[in-house]
From Swiss-Prot:
Signal sequence annotation: none
Domain of life: Bacteria
Biological classification of the source: Bacteria, Bacillati, Cyanobacteriota, Cyanophyceae, Synechococcales
Protein name: Large ribosomal subunit protein bL34
A biological process term (GO) from this entry: translation
Keyword Mitochondrion: no
HAMAP family given in the database record: Ribosomal_bL34
Region of interest (Disordered), ranges: 1-45
Length: 45
C-alpha cells in the first residue's frame, strides 16, 4: 500500500509564488521590491 508523502508539485509552486506570478500583481511587486531592498539572494521561488 502506497502512502501519500504530501511532497507538493513544482508547477503549483511556480504558478503561485514564482517570480512571474509575483510581478503580475501590485502586491507581488511590493514583495519583490522588499526582498530586493533587504538583499535577499533569492527573490522568488
Amino acid at each position: 500500500m502506497t502512502q501519500r508523502t504530501l511532497g507538493g508539485t513544482n508547477r503549483k509552486q511556480k504558478r503561485t509564488s514564482g517570480f512571474r506570478a509575483r510581478m503580475r500583481t501590485h502586491n507581488g511587486r511590493k514583495v519583490i521590491q522588499a526582498r530586493r531592498s533587504k538583499g535577499r539572494h533569492r527573490l522568488a521561488v
